From Swiss-Prot:
GO molecular function, one term: N-acyltransferase activity
An individual GO BP term: lipid A biosynthetic process
Catalytic activity, as annotated: a UDP-3-O-[(3R)-3-hydroxyacyl]-alpha-D-glucosamine + a (3R)-hydroxyacyl-[ACP] = a UDP-2-N,3-O-bis[(3R)-3-hydroxyacyl]-alpha-D-glucosamine + holo-[ACP] + H(+)
Protein name per Swiss-Prot or TrEMBL: UDP-3-O-acylglucosamine N-acyltransferase
Pfam families referenced in this protein's UniProt entry, alphabetically: Hexapep (PF00132), LpxD (PF04613)
EC number: 2.3.1.191
Active site (UniProt): H257
Membrane-spanning parts: none
Length: 348
């Protein structure tokens, strides 16, 4: 259940409203007038809660739940108690999330810390910076020379935007974010501690020591990207580092210089992607994946958590392990090792 101390619903919805907004089919119209004012898990549901069940293995928890309505698939309908409105859909979690964004808009687009959307007199702003209307810059933020910021963007307290950077419309730049040598699109969200556009790890060694290679590229972040807390993205050496439209990157991820990440990718926490690697559209990396430099990962690829990718991966494949290889091969090798261990144990 949402904690109303932090997240207050912006409105109330009836079950009929929810069905209309999502296109879900309401099986018991007598519940149309019932009010929904919060989201919950099945276990923590209270009066007014909306829940969802997407897999049959979780459906037993419906019994005894206090939720007023549930999104579910056709195969789960028979498990829903008579006390609950049934909203049938092929995408329960997606529809649940849609209603959540309507009920709690502040949870997906953070609001100013001080409650007022204005340019604070206590921000440090270079006189050449340019802002569109409805920009909010909070106290303690630093905005460098020739920066341009689009309409409706929020720059939080202690964020630092370096000279010549461009930030689009309706973006959220959280506290302690630093941005330099970067072009950022619309509706981008950078969470606390994110560092964008710093030097890449480029050096050349020799008998006289280690010399730095100038990093002369940029970071391009396309529309709709979200980047989690304390993630770092290095600018390119000569090319750009690019994060494609709609991609979502978790906390504590390192993306090196010249990396190209496609559209609508998902990258979980603690991944490390080495320089000049490219990742195709709609690919997914589990937590803790490491990718070597100059690797080409195709479109719609899935990589299991803690894998080490050292070879190119074709479109649509699922890989895992270290070094990573196709799932079937990985599982066979794991099974073989287990059977060898059993044989050795029996012989001893």
């Amino acid at each position: 259940m949402a904690d109303t101390f932090f997240f207050t619903p912006s409105r109330q919805l009836t079950v009929a409203n929810v069905a209309e907004l999502t296109g879900a089919k309401l099986l018991n119209p007598e519940f149309s007038h019932k009010v929904i004012n919060t989201l919950s898990s099945l276990e923590n549901a209270v009066e007014g809660s909306l829940v969802f069940v997407e897999h049959r293995k979780f459906s037993d928890a419906l019994q005894g739940s206090s939720a007023v309505a549930v999104f579910c698939t056709n195969e789960i309908v028979f498990k829903v108690p008579d006390t609950m409105a049934v909203l049938v859909t092929s995408t329960p979690q997606r529809d649940f999330a849609q209603i959540g964004r309507i009920l709690f808009p502040d949870s997906v687009k953070p609001m100013p810390w001080f409650g007022q959307k204005e340019i604070s007199p206590h921000a440090h702003i270079h006189p050449t910076a340019k802002f569109a209307h409805d920009v909010c810059i909070e106290a303690g933020a630093v905005i460098g020379r020739n920066v341009e910021i689009g309409a409706g963007t929020l720059i939080s307290s202690t964020a630092v935007i370096g000279e010549n950077c461009r930030i689009g419309r309706d973006c959220y730049i959280a506290p302690k974010v630093t941005v330099q040598c970067s072009l950022i699109g619309d509706t981008v969200q950078l969470y606390p501690g994110v560092c964008i556009g710093q030097d890449g790890f480029g050096y050349v060694g020799g008998i006289s020591g280690i010399e730095k290679i100038p990093q002369l590229g940029r970071v391009i972040i396309e529309d709709g990207v979200e980047i989690g807390a304390n993630t770092t993205i290095d600018r390119g050496t000569f090319q750009d580092t690019v994060i494609g439209e709609g991609s979502k990157i978790d906390n504590l991820v390192q993306i090196a210089h010249n990396v190209k990440i496609g559209r609508y990718c998902l990258i979980a926490a603690q991944c490390g992607i080495a320089g000049s690697t490219s990742i195709g559209d709609m690919s997914q990396l589990g937590g803790g994946v490491g990718v070597a430099d100059h690797i080409v990962i195709g479109k719609c690829v899935q990589i299991a958590a803690r894998s080490g990718v050292m070879n190119d991966i074709p479109d649509g494949e699922k890989w895992g392990g270290s070094p990573a290889r196709p799932f079937k091969q990985w599982f066979r090798e794991v099974a073989t090792l287990r059977s060898m261990g059993k044989v050795k144990k029996e012989r001893s």
